[in-house]
Amino acid sequence: VDHQNILLAAGVDQRGCLYAVGEFLRQISVRNGVLELPGQLEVRTAPAFEIRGTQVGQSDVAKNLAKVRDWTDKETQRVILDYALAGANIFSTGYGKKYDFLKSFGLMTQGEFGANTAAGKIPEAWEAKESIGRTGYVCLSVPEGKDYMLKLCDDYFRDRPAFDLVKFWGGDGGGCECDKCKPYGLTFIKTVEKMAEIIHKYHPETKIYFTNQKFDNADDNAIFSYLQEKPRDWLWAWGYGPGSDATSWQPGHRQTHRMDLFNYPGYGPYSLYPKEILHQLPPQQKLLYYNEITHWKYAQHAFIQMYPRADREGNLPPHWSHDIYERRPDQFLTMVYNRLTFYACPRNYFRVFNDLMPYGVGDITHSSGHHDHFNQWMWQRLLWAPRTTLDEVVNEYCRTWFGKEAAPLMAKALYLLEKNIEEQPGIPLPQKTGISEYYDLVRRAGPLMPKQTMDQDWLWRMYMQKGALDRYVQLSVEQQMQLQSRIEKRISTALKNDESLKAIEESLGWFELKDTPEMAAMKEEARVLGEESNRLFGDRNDGYFNLQHDFIGLGWLKRQLERARSARPRERRELLNMVVDYENPGEGGFYDNLGTYNPAPHVVAGYPYDHGQPYVSEMMSEGNRASQRSMHFTQNEEQGVTLHYTDLDPKATYQIRFTFVRPWYQDRYAPRMNQKCQSIYADDQLIAKNVELPFKMSDFFTYDIPAKATSDGDLTIRLEKAGDVARGDRVSVEQWRNSGGWGTLVSEVWLMKKK
């Protein structure tokens, strides 16, 4: 700014001028209706990465669960420009209004095409063996099917404007597991080469890349060999997205992993495979990312839902490259918020960015809505200037969107939000002081924003909704825990005073819980804020419509009391003892709580059950205690879940109690899920055959252990899958595995001395 108050903003091209405007807007502040600029404003900058992009649109979750209105065309365009002003230069789009708008600002476009994605119903003989059995995908080894896909490609790109980039995705969904296609990676890349010829016939300047999503090691190696065989000038880049990483077990799941790369883990699992890909690629091909930073759980870089299952070769993450699997969503908040809820993860995504991006030419991130606003905005700023520190990019975001005065409070709130939504061992949700701190920070920031900004600020209202809803959930969980504690104390006293029936009746009358005044206030605040943010910009937090849950398993507690009321005195005492001292196996006994990060010291075979798909509430009854709905399992292995005990009393007799439950499956998975039963062995002696696991709501199963099995002081308990489970051809078994199939399954085990 010179003495004549003239501001000069210049760019080397049309987009450069747009970025200059973005820099100007980030530098100014508004005070009392007046624009203020720094005293000295001299900025000369250029982007660090060639490709900087994302996707724009509203999610089905927002429309169906959060009940938001549709965006207008102008609002869609505003979101595009928000990210472009932050530094984006390319957006994923189809043809039509969005394409035309992008081109009007000199922005680049990315088109997409599924190499084996059908455009409608196809003959059954053409159907691919997709990894989880989805239909509508073509087997490219069927000549007529391949010709059909080539014609689809020609029809789509002929007589239409050119995209700057075209992405061919490899899987999720798509691909084919059949023997004729193996290795599918080679079948796929040869088909993509033919499709690239078609595109270049009409649009010779379009750059082509593919993604290896859900490919296995053989697929990737076949593509490496194909690219190394001779120059493939038609291909610009290898695309890397969810399911591409051969050194992580995050969704979407790969079936095999490059265990050899873990010998020296370097900076950790995120960077191992990009480095290997770059090593294998010929120099004319680039590595381009398609990072998934839109889901807060069960996704490429998100909180894990459960500990990952073993891959097709039985491999699990090595313990020295393991930290990403220790990030779990808060076990209560995850019951309320959809995968596509409003959130921010500054620390985690900053780490991911810095682990991955040194190996690529840029990123066109995956976004499934507008709930990931901070993540996407931060990513674009880092693609422009990757040496920016985390505090710098967070502070810049808060100044840009909330104003200079409110920024410090909002920056603290962003860090707290990420911490609050993560499970913290030993600190359950009611003890998380950050919930109230976050709410207070965002509330205090509101009045510090310029009035004209605050009146129209949908984004602050989204952060405030999150605070009110999290506080409501915290209070609800605390209320339920207090009820459980009250009942446990009452039953404990009754057992000592021999008045159990009276205590049961009293306790059963306490289960109807109502919102406290503070809970009601939080819910009402979230409702009002949600209506305002929806009116202002078609955004609202889905959690408001999903607040009522049995968070801690009160359903089990109520059922146990009802059973005790109907039982005979001795059985009643046993049932009530579990109410007051649930895990206690008695003197000389052992308890194992199987599942993700639970103490199960006697397990020697099996691993935590991850459900094979995003967990939804319908899969298990919320009436289960947390320990009852978390399990170990095996897949198609011949050895089922196994526990081994040593140093037992050879003169004692033992019995064993299991908690069993089996999940519900979504319609697209259910037809191949025939597993219901399992058998139980003590050493090599069958003690229970074809035990049917209860559906959704767990129950207990108790058996005597033959004295012979414990006479040497050792005992092996082994589960065995039913004879008709995981049988059949290779493809059907793989689809079953990939969809969450289980052979044996168990939640808890008590080994107890008989009295």
Mark where each language-model region is:
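Short, surface-exposed beta-strand/loop "edge" segments at domain boundaries and coil↔beta transitions
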Residues: 15-19, 62-65, 470-473, 724-730
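Contiguous, structured surface segment used for ligand recognition
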Residues: 1-49
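C-terminal non-catalytic alpha-helical accessory regions
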Residues: 367-376, 384-579
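Generic recognition of long tandem-repeat/solenoid scaffolds
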Residues: 7-11, 37, 136, 455-461, ...
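Catalytic-core regions of glycoside hydrolase
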Residues: 29-33, 57-59, 66-70, 77, ...
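Extracytoplasmic
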Residues: 565-755
